């Protein structure tokens, strides 16, 4: 009886294991042998001062690709303050004041402590940091000192902007937008690859807004702004080793800047007499009230010629730039 039970148990065990083995064999012998990999978007840029990927370097950084920049509606460097940790670029009432702070390090006036590079071209004047950004394919924000590779004025960090490359993208883009306080904007850009050795891109924009504040003195818009500009880029690759990259960018800004209002405290109101200019006001920041409307006008031209030669085991990179800035500021103090 014991032998019968043992043989029966062995038979049941073999029978129960048979479907499992057959099922395993069916999975292994499946006819679908394709493999699917999910990878992030690849953005190809030319960065001559680095030999490793940004995420492989021993530094803290934040990077934005073109799709993310457009989805976040980034119009200038100030907008990145919302999305980049330890980075701040306050709004002081006009595009003239462009102080940048990284990890608490910055400069209110004179030499900046954070540098900005556009397609490898340094922006030298702090008065030109606050500019309209468009035709941008990638932005890198490097936290901490970068003086070893980028020299002075990068004690706090560095911001690198890269334009869309016409060798990698061809087509025409048009962007229209309208918002509150009659915010209006139009951008147009065209990218064309002439052949395997030459490509170019042209872009232009106009933007404006009536503003959020009224000058109580004459009823005019205290922060009205209108600006426009254009950009051109030409790339030439005569050989596999030699590359030329010419960039020219112009922007004009005219705005009723510095919509500052007086701050009135409760103690000042309690002691104000009927003849005091504070009589009848409310506690807090008052609307602008200036007999001469503050305004700011600025012309910027940035041009650069980048040359790269790839030798056998070495690279030679050169960037020659010329920058022009003329502005006018009127502030009622």
Per-region residue spans from a language model:
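Periplasmic-side early beta-strands and strand-to-turn transitions of outer-membrane beta-barrels
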Residues: 168-169, 177, 193-292, 325-333
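Outer-membrane beta-barrel transmembrane strand signature
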Residues: 285-308
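N-terminal plug
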Residues: 33-34, 45-59, 66-93, 109-111, ...
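Outer-membrane beta-barrel translocator/receptor signature
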Residues: 98, 112, 125, 135-137, ...
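N-terminal Sec signal peptide and the immediately downstream disordered periplasmic leader
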Residues: 3-72, 79-82, 240, 303
């Amino acid at each position: 009886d014991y032998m019968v039970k043992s043989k029966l148990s062995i038979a049941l065990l073999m029978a129960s294991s048979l479907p499992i083995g057959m099922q395993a064999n069916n999975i292994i012998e499946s006819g679908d042998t394709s493999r699917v990999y999910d990878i992030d978007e690849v953005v190809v840029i030319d960065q001559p001062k680095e030999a490793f990927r940004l995420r492989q370097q021993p530094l803290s950084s934040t990077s934005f690709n073109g799709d993310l920049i457009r989805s976040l509606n980034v119009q200038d460097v100030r907008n990145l303050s919302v999305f980049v940790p330890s980075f701040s670029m306050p709004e002081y009432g006009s595009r003239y004041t462009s102080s940048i702070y990284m990890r608490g390090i910055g400069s209110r006036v004179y030499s900046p402590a954070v540098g900005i590079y556009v397609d490898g071209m340094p922006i030298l004047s702090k008065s030109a940091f606050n500019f309209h950004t468009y035709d941008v394919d990638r932005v890198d924000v490097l936290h901490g000192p970068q003086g070893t590779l980028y020299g002075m004025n990068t004690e706090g960090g560095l911001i690198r902007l890269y334009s869309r490359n016409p060798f990698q993208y061809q087509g025409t883009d048009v962007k229209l937008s309208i918002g509150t306080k009659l915010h209006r904007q139009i951008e147009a850009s065209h990218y064309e690859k002439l052949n395997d050795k030459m490509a170019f891109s042209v872009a232009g924009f106009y933007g404006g807004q009536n503003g959020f504040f009224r000058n109580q003195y004459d009823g005019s818009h205290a922060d009205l702004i209108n600006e426009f500009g254009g950009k051109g880029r030409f790339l030439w690759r005569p050989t596999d080793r030699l590359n030329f990259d010419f960039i020219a960018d112009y922007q004009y800004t005219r705005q009723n800047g510095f919509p500052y209002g007086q701050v009135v405290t409760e103690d000042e109101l309690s002691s104000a007499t009927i003849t005091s200019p504070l009589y009848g006001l409310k506690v807090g920041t008052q609307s602008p009230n200036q007999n001469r409307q503050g305004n700011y006008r600025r012309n910027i031209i940035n041009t650069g010629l980048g040359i790269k030669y790839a030798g056998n085991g070495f690279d030679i990179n050169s960037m020659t730039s010329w920058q022009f800035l003329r502005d006018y500021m009127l502030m009622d103090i």
